[in-house]
Amino acid sequence: MGSTRDRLLPPMPVNVLWGWLGPLLVAVFGGILRFVNLGRPHAVVFDETYYIKDAYALLHYGVERASLGTTEDPIADRMLLSGNTDFLVKCTPPDADPCPLYVAHPPLGKWMIGVGEQIFGLNPYGWRFAAAVVGVLSILILARVARRMTRSTLLGCLAGLLLSVEGLHLVLSRTALLDIFLMFWVLAGFACLVADRDWARGRLVTWYESSPLSDQGPGLGLRPWRIAAGLCLGAACAVKWSGIFFLIGFAVMSLLWDAGARRAVGLREPYRGAFGKDLTSILLAMGLLPAFVYVVSWAGWFASPLGWGRNWAQATSQGPAFFVFDSIRSWLSYHMQVLGFHTGLASTHPYQSEPWSWPLLLRPVAFFYETPATKCGADSCSQAVLGVGTPVIWYGGLVALLTMIVWYVATRDWRAGAVLASYAFGWLPWFYYAISDNRTMYLFYAITMTPFMILALTLTAGLIIGRADAAPNRRALGAAVVGAFTLLALINLGWLYPVLVAEVIPHSQWWTRMLFRSWA
């Protein structure tokens, strides 16, 4: 029976202290990169112009509110950079046009940005604080989930280290955009499901060892890690709607894991067992619970008369039952308009790119660029924030993803399948919008793919190093190859670092860091 347990549930590394201390040290390193000079540049960077003001309005009104100025003349941006927070449009009555603001994304990511603004004030450090926190936490989570998937603390720390020095993750961890929060909740949901996989297999093996076999096996009861995954993925959808691709994909993947576990213990009807015994729990945990989280994220809109499309006077014109009915009707109408906006978003932008070009880093987004008068030892200086990944990691990641395809075809290893599927959930849906709608898209949308690309690199590193019982010379050579790659990634990040974090450097040095003309 022990062999069945070991086969279904390989033992975790025995050193629990290093299992936490190693990932924490890697996260601290990533935190230093993200928090040092977090308030630089002292400017409103790219789409921060929307989310930092929305976050401020949510803190004070519970809903987003219109601000002074336009895209061409951002009066509000200049006011808040000077410390003036009186930048919201005032209306009498307060729910009259144009004060209610139409927004295209759910509120949760902006509420998270608002936490930093509440603690540190409405300044660049304050509005970027939450992004940096979740960036560091995602390093820790990735290190821990990689450790669980590989049963190796060393490989877990490698995954965290690679995410620490991944350029796009670094930039988004230092910028108040929504995508870093989306990535965080997606990764957290994935980590919970991997933990649930182990938990469920442990329950199944215990049943197998102590009960007579049946064709389908038992129901596995309340599954806390699956519930946690539902909460996280509901939060992902409450940041951006693209979280739903992961919610659906992960739910199917988790159900297939259940069927695989039942097959592995020798049940004759594993799929009927999984669908018959586990489908209800997955619908609750990955269906109703995420929907509940999503609706709750709109609590400010439901509770305030000031939200766009709220129709408060109409909703309160009759009794409580009509209030609930009319509020839901207005909320759904709002969502239909947002859906129309997203499907028809085809305006051109100088930094837009197609999803098939993202893995090659062909067109990054210049979040910020100035030619400051500050002396930098040259006649012309540059200060830039370029939203681009670390090329060594991304191009190495392509090789690793191809390795995962070969590995999965050859062995059906669940880890390769999970990484490939998760990467696809963050990438392939955008092909539809690019082809059918010609939708405006950007490289930084690929941030949700990045943790799974790094997991592919980590699993490939494990294959290169070899099993613990492999010949010492073979493992030493593999470790040297992996170490050399990691060193190259560190050097590559160090080379790019000035144009990722807005250091003032000579223009010639900025230009040498533009790997392709399309980067400039």
PLM regions with names:
Residues 1-33, 277-290, 420, 475-484:
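Start-transfer (signal-anchor) and selected internal transmembrane alpha helices
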Residues 35, 39-83, 279-282, 286, ...:
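Aromatic-rich transmembrane-lumenal/periplasmic boundary elements in polytopic membrane proteins
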Residues 44-45, 131, 171-181, 239-242:
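Short acidic/glycine- and proline-prone juxtamembrane loop motifs at membrane-interface regions
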Residues 50-120, 124, 207-218, 367-385:
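Interfacial juxtamembrane loops and adjacent helix segments
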Residues 129-150, 188, 403-404:
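Transmembrane-helix motifs of polytopic, lipid-linked glycan transferases
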Residues 217-225, 233, 252, 258-259, ...:
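Transmembrane helical bundles and short interhelical boundary loops of multi-pass, membrane-embedded
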